[in-house]
Amino acid sequence: MAGRFAPRSARAALPHQEAAPAAGATAPSNGTPAVRAAEPTHDAPAVRETAPSQGTPPLRAAEPAQGTPAVRAAAPAHDTPPLTREWTPPGPLDLRLVLGPLRRGPADPTFRMVADGTFWRATRTPEGPGTLRVASRGDRIAAAAWGPGADWLLTGLPALLGADDDPDAFVPRHRLLALTRHRRPGLRLLRTGLVMESLIPSILEQKVTTDEAYRAWRHLVRRFGTPAPGPTADLGLHVMPDPRGWAMIPSWEWHRANVDAKRSSTILRAVRVARRLEEAATMNLPEALTRLELIPGIGPWTSAETLQRSNGAPDAVTVGDLHLPGIVGHALADHRDADDEEMLALLTPYEGQRHRATRLILLSGRTPKRRAPRMTPGNIVNL
């Protein structure tokens, strides 16, 4: 949490991945090339296998209807006008601060912020893939959405931008936090209502550098996800795979993405019960934490990082982080060597708002100077 906030060139498909296009798939209009089995491009994912590799556990809870083809066609032409909505927030709103936690690195294929201050987000909703474009227009928020999930995204726009958050519930007990809150009046805690889209990248971030995790996320989403609906070709936006898509990723592709067996196995266990995990988005924090942590490999760090985004949980404090205890200790007690126990003790006055307190501490800029070299990224690709 403390440290987060180039496209890889396409690889030729392996021989086993060559397959005929799905029946009825045709080349889209407007000059978009059709997906070819052996020539993946930057704008379209490589054709996936129709069966998992040997040893990959079968998918149970998230199996699609019988007859669903594994091979996907290229994104269709986008001449359908988007659905639109305007919303007026009840107070100051800084889109960068609110939406920033959704961004997994500068080249996240599911998230973009462009030069004019517009934010783009590609996601997989309960209604299907969707793309959301959000921009500030004075005191209003203007949004447009494309794809099967467009209506779902626009309906959830206020919650996404923190309409359900109550920043006044936070009472600063330290001058640093009082000043930071005053300087950042547009901070709201977002709520996506989607668990898996935050859970999977959080699992990828376990025990590795953020650069390693971001690289793995980019590789897997671009290769096995789908082009985002709407006018997104120039942005390179992709929607992450559905649960079956994650389960179908061969073991060697996890290896190429530099994801070890422990993390990939955790993701595979999670996607098998994706529907049950998504139910956590409507639960109170203790019940939601329990639901996620029933999956082996998902602990307090991963569940907190997920529910901060999916549920907008103001008390979902991140424990087990390499840097956060020292940052909190330095900011509140001038003790940069604090551990989780000391961090939680310092955050006791903010019970119920501990996640918000840590966000404000990180935004304050009061962080200890680095004393040691950065953690060296691991690399299992050539093993």
Write out the residue ranges for each language-model feature:
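HhH-family (HhH-GPD) DNA N-glycosylase catalytic core used in base-excision repair
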Residues: M1-R36, R72-L383
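Acidic, glycine-centered low-complexity repeats within long intrinsically disordered regions
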Residues: A25-A27, G31-E39, D43, E49-A51, ...
